[in-house]
A protein has these predicted regions:
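Residue-level signal for the short linker/turn that defines the boundary of a DNA-recognition helix
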Residues: 12-14, 72, 88, 252
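Basic, flexible linker segments flanking DNA-binding modules
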Residues: 19, 26-128, 227-228, 281-290
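Active-site beta-loop-alpha junctions of metal-dependent nucleic acid enzymes
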Residues: 138, 142, 160-187
């Protein structure tokens, strides 16, 4: 309209006059003029890569369909594509997934300052575990309590349990599973040097729970009150457990739930990718650390 000629004066109306009559901001007009024309591609200049966007979309869909876990972001899809021999940059994978509605759904909340500037992630396994509980419903037996124990170094599930009761003895079960699995036996002092992170629930703070943990040689490390970030490793696994099992399936009995939890923990340890460990699975990280520890022992024996 600003380039149209006035029939009276045979001159252009001009952008300022049109904006004033239409009561719109000239800044908005100039900003819209700077936007890319609709026929112009938003792609970065240069070679496309080994496959086109359509082919890459097909590869991404195959990886999503083949995975039995939900909620994985574009970085883990990029890693799975790389393992499958499909090379593409993480930014391109994210763009293609966004354009095709394949990104994991998430909520954008308000950003605020967080005082938790430390870390609860350990460098090696068997230095700190986290334990927590959640609840679900079975059809025949009603409410069921789910207890987990998770390794802080590699996010590995080392113990998982379900029961009708949520008392201190049931809360101990995943910890005892982890001790037997990682240290080979249930005996006094067998897990010396290990810390256990838990919240201030009455079952975890009870005398029986604390005495049993102390007997095994474990140092209790409760998180701060009303600060779930302190037990974030266990909290994050419970979110994954809900998104991939508890919210997707129904169970008739607690025993059926317990069997499903054991199977899910096995599959999780073998297939879940941990980004901070180079997109390796928890089982791979533990196996690599075990091999390094054995090599260190062999070197000491040779040196002696």
């Amino acid at each position: 309209m600003s380039q149209a000629l006035s029939p009276s004066f045979a001159r252009c109306y001009g952008l300022a006059r049109v904006a004033r009559v239409w009561k719109i901001s000239r800044a908005s007009v100039y900003r819209s003029l700077k936007e890319m024309p609709p026929n112009t591609s938003a792609r970065r200049p240069g070679p496309v890569g080994a496959c086109s966007d359509a082919e890459l979309t097909d590869h991404i869909r195959r990886q999503i369909d083949a995975s039995r876990l939900h909620g994985e972001g574009y970085r883990k899809l990029w890693a799975r594509l790389r393992f499958a021999g499909v090379r593409a940059s993480p930014r391109r994978v994210r763009r293609v997934m966004r354009e095709n509605g394949l990104l994991a759904p998430h909520r954008l909340g308000r950003t605020k300052a967080k005082p938790h500037d430390g870390t609860i992630i350990t460098d090696k396994v068997n230095e700190m575990w986290g334990t927590d509980m959640t609840q679900t419903i079975t059809i025949r037996e009603g409410r069921a309590n789910v207890f987990v124990a998770v390794e802080h170094a590699n996010s590995e599930v080392i113990g998982i349990h379900a029961s009708r009761s949520a008392n201190r003895f049931e809360a101990l079960e995943p910890v005892r599973q982890g001790v037997h699995r990682c240290f080979g036996a249930i005996a006094p002092g067998v897990a010396r040097g290990l810390k256990l992170r838990h919240d201030h629930g009455s079952n975890y703070m009870s005398g029986d729970f604390q005495d049993e943990v102390k007997c095994l040689g474990i140092e209790a490390s409760p998180s701060f009150v009303r600060e779930p970030e302190g037990n974030g490793v266990a909290e994050r696994f419970i979110r994954t457990l809900k998104e991939n099992l508890l919210w997707l399936r129904t169970f008739d009995t607690i025993e059926e739930l317990r069997a499903a939890l054991v199977e899910f923990a096995r599959r999780y340890n073998e297939t879940w990718l941990v980004a901070r460990h180079g997109y390796r699975t928890p089982a791979q990280v533990r196996a690599d650390q075990r091999r390094l520890d054995q090599d260190a022992v062999d070197d000491l024996q040779l040196a002696a």
